[in-house]
């Protein structure tokens, strides 16, 4: 069980530390480090709390119960439908975000390293064909690729932070370049970067429903990304003053804008290479994990056979919709992450608060109960509504877009 506990911590941390981390400096550039730090700690606490709420609900059902079945038990058919729709939307939005971001970076990498000019569209198509092919072959190949890529990603993250440390200036971290509305606009992107709740049912099953150990799995597993994110913000926001950063992002939108900002301010080929490689690996590992989950979910939903023809059909319905998004909205990486925040707000905030409310009515003498009582459940529910509201205000143009 010790190995399973450690493995589960890494699953939570590995699911969380991914491409969302790359979008954070884009969201934080106009907000400032101190406000970003408050948002990071606040949203981490919120997401960790709701994972513990799900754990409280799971103590009353078999450990291998799916989230949809749990929703049907406590919230009825409509609750099950809302949960299923949110899961589908979340995984499609994330897959689209990762295809968009990875395709852009792949095209840039190939152009830099080979001298052959490649458009972002060609990069998106190439990445989808290769990485999507790996997913279509099956879990064993994904696992093989993911072990190598994740190990390399952690190495490059450490290298990247070490190389950026000498370029950090305290004054950049102390300035407060708060533009009106940007703090609110940054919430969906940072919130999505703490999303691991889709894997909660799998981890509960893997740990055989051991509540005591699962509490530490979710607390430590989500705290590791928090620490990594804080160091990443110190490294990026500390290296580049906000005025320069915002100016560069105006000329070079998206992830390439971040890389361009680091390239111009730090002026070190080693830093640029480390950041670029980490970005590529973060997007690849995030894509493989989410796309595999989406592929298996759709194969089960549409009852596709496990033959070559069946897997190709599942591959088509898995990758064609997000590919179309990536092609028609080539700068949609941050936007797609924000929309994923809508579905994640339902799955990670609204659904857990409702499930816990109903579970406590059905099981008043629960052995494990998260502190906070009903007022905390109301706050969690309202936070879910607020995250969704912020995203729609951004879409309506009433709040500024980030990145």
Curated annotation (Swiss-Prot):
InterPro entries: Amino_acid_transport_2, Trp/try_permease_CS, Trp_tyr_transpt. Induction: Repressed by tyrosine and induced by phenylalanine under the control of the regulatory protein TyrR. The promoter region of tyrP contains two adjacent TyrR boxes, which are the targets for the action of TyrR. In the presence of tyrosine and ATP, binding of hexameric TyrR to both TyrR boxes inhibits binding of RNA polymerase (RNAP) to the tyrP promoter and leads to tyrosine-mediated repression of the gene. In the presence of phenylalanine, TyrR binds as a dimer to the upstream box, which enhances the binding of RNAP to the tyrP promoter and leads to phenylalanine-mediated activation. One of its GO terms (biological process) is amino acid transmembrane transport. Keywords: Amino-acid transport, Cell inner membrane, Cell membrane, Membrane, Symport, Transmembrane, Transmembrane helix, Transport. The keyword Transport applies. GO terms for molecular function: aromatic amino acid transmembrane transporter activity; symporter activity; transmembrane transporter activity. It comes from the Bacteria. Belongs to the amino acid/polyamine transporter 2 family. Mtr/TnaB/TyrP permease subfamily. Transports tyrosine across the cytoplasmic membrane. The transport system is energized by the proton motive force. This is Tyrosine-specific transport system. The lineage of its organism: Bacteria, Pseudomonadati, Pseudomonadota, Gammaproteobacteria, Enterobacterales.
């Amino acid at each position: 069980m010790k190995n399973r506990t450690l493995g589960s911590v890494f699953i939570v941390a590995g699911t969380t530390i991914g491409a969302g981390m790359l979008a954070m400096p884009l969201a934080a550039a106009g907000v400032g480090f101190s406000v970003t730090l408050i948002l990071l700690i606040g949203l981490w606490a919120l997401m960790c709390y709701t994972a513990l709420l799900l754990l409280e609900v799971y103590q009353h059902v078999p450990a291998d119960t799916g989230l949809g079945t749990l929703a049907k038990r406590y919230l009825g058919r409509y609750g099950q439908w809302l949960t299923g729709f949110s899961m589908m939307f979340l995984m499609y939005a994330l897959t689209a975000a990762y295809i968009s971001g990875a395709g852009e970076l792949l095209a840039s990498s190939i152009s830099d390293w080979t001298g052959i000019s490649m458009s972002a569209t060609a990069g998106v198509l190439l990445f989808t064909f290769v990485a999507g092919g790996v997913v279509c072959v099956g879990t064993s190949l994904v696992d093989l690729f993911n072990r190598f890529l994740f190990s390399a990603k952690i190495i490059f993250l450490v290298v990247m932070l070490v190389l950026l440390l000498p370029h950090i200036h305290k004054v950049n971290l102390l300035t407060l370049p708060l533009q009106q509305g940007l703090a609110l606009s940054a919430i969906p992107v940072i919130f999505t970067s703490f999303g691991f709740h889709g894997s909660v049912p799998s981890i509960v099953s893997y740990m055989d429903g051991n509540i005591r150990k699962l509490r530490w799995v979710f607390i430590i597993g989500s705290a590791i990304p928090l620490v990594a994110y804080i160091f990443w913000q110190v490294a990026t926001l500390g290296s580049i003053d906000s005025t320069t950063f915002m100016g560069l992002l105006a000329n070079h939108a998206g992830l390439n804008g971040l890389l361009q900002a680091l390239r111009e301010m730090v002026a070190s080929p080693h830093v640029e290479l480390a950041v670029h490689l980490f970005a590529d690996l973060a997007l690849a590992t995030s894509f493989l994990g989410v796309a595999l989950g989406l592929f298996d979910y759709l194969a089960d939903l549409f009852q596709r056979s496990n033959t070559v023809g069946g897997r190709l059909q599942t591959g088509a319905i898995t990758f064609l919709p997000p590919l179309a998004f990536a092609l028609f909205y080539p700068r949609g990486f941050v936007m797609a992450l924000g929309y994923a925040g809508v579905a994640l707000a339902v799955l990670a905030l609204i659904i857990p608060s409702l499930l816990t409310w109903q579970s406590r009515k059905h099981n008043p003498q629960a052995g494990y109960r998260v502190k906070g009582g009903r007022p905390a459940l109301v706050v969690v529910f309202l936070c879910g509504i607020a995250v969704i509201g912020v995203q729609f205000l951004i879409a309506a143009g009433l709040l500024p877009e980030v990145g």
